[in-house]
Swiss-Prot record:
Tissue and organ expression note: Expressed in brain. Found in a subpopulation of neurons widely distributed and enriched in Purkinje cells of the cerebellum and in the reticular thalamic and medial habenular nuclei.
Subunit structure: Component of heteromultimeric potassium channels. Identified in potassium channel complexes containing KCND1, KCND2, KCND3, KCNIP1, KCNIP2, KCNIP3, KCNIP4, DPP6 and DPP10. Part of a heterooctamer composed of the tetrameric channel and four KCNIP1 chains. Probably part of a complex consisting of KCNIP1, KCNIP2 isoform 3 and KCND2. Self-associates to form homodimers and homotetramers. Interacts with KCNIP2 isoform 3 in a calcium-dependent manner.
Lineage, top ranks: Eukaryota, Metazoa, Chordata, Craniata, Vertebrata
The protein, known as: A-type potassium channel modulatory protein KCNIP1
Family per similarity comment: Belongs to the recoverin family.
Domain EF-hand: 38-94, 97-132, 133-168, 181-216
Gene: Kcnip1
UniProt keyword Nucleus present: no
Localization terms from the record: Cell membrane; Cytoplasm; Cell projection, Dendrite
Region (Interaction with KCND2): 214-227
InterPro entries named among the record's database cross-references: EF-hand-dom_pair (IPR011992), EF_Hand_1_Ca_BS (IPR018247), EF_hand_dom (IPR002048), Recoverin (IPR028846)
Binding-site residues for Ca(2+) 1, renumbered to this chain: 146, 148, 150, 152, 157
Originating species: Mus musculus
Membrane topology: Peripheral membrane protein
Pfam families with a match to the protein in the record: EF-hand_7, EF-hand_8
Cited SMART domains: EFh
Length: 227
């Protein structure tokens, strides 16, 4: 992960918001957009169990109200399907193809595998990515990389993730990436992570390797930049 994530910290892309954490930007944008209105009126449509969400996440009730109103503005039906999710996500990476990575990200948000993401799914993931512990963020990242959800990461899955990130970054990267760069990073990833050399990386191996490597821990911020 250090090789994979560390590499991205050196990539400079001409994106619309190159230095913004997208998850944080979304929250700030919706808060600034709606905060004045909330002073005058209460949110009319809320998900059931707002207090329960407050207990389950790291957001306050007011923050949840802001996020819910923003979510409803973007997704009036109260849920977002994969196609809509891809369209929204693509706006952050106009110079690349974000569709494949958005597909993997959508599956990580869709924890019940229903083909749609509810507000509860969205805000739970956002809470982890913005305010979760290091351990929580690592577990969430592992789940994202574990594409087929079988409990471990193999080389094919890691290769798919890395290629999807490179496609998303597009051709406006510096330094220019060579064709074999993704494979090289995946090989280094497995040299560090696959402790028992059995060709797969388990959650325990992933957590241990990440927390032992300062470079990996510093690069956690990079993941949030493409979240």
């Amino acid at each position: 992960m250090g090789a994979v994530m560390g590499t991205f910290s050196s990539l400079q892309t001409k994106q619309r918001r190159p230095s913004k954490d997208i998850a944080w930007w979304y929250y700030q944008y919706q808060r600034d957009k709606i905060e004045d209105e909330l002073e005058m009126t209460m949110v009319c449509h809320r998900p059931e169990g707002l207090e329960q969400l407050e207990a389950q996440t790291n957001f306050t009730k007011r923050e949840l109200q802001v996020l819910y109103r923003g979510f409803k503005n973007e997704c009036p039906s109260g849920v977002v399907n994969e196609e809509t999710f891809k369209q929204i996500y693509a706006q952050f990476f106009p110079h690349g193809d974000a569709s494949t990575y958005a597909h993997y990200l959508f599956n990580a948000f869709d924890t019940t595998q229903t083909g749609s993401v509810k507000f509860e799914d969205f805000v739970t993931a956002l809470s982890i990515l913005l305010r979760g512990t290091v351990h929580e963020k690592l577990r969430w990242t592992f789940n994202l990389y574990d594409i087929n959800k079988d409990g471990y990461i193999n080389k094919e899955e890691m290769m798919d993730i890395v290629k999807a990130i490179y496609d998303m970054m597009g051709k406006y990267t510096y330094p220019v990436l060579k064709e074999d760069t993704p494979r090289q990073h995946v090989d280094v990833f497995f040299q560090k992570m696959d402790k028992n050399k059995d060709g797969i990386v388990t959650l325990d191996e992933f957590l241990e390797s990440c927390q032992e490597d300062d470079n990996i821990m510093r690069s956690l911020q990079l993941f949030q930049n493409v979240m």
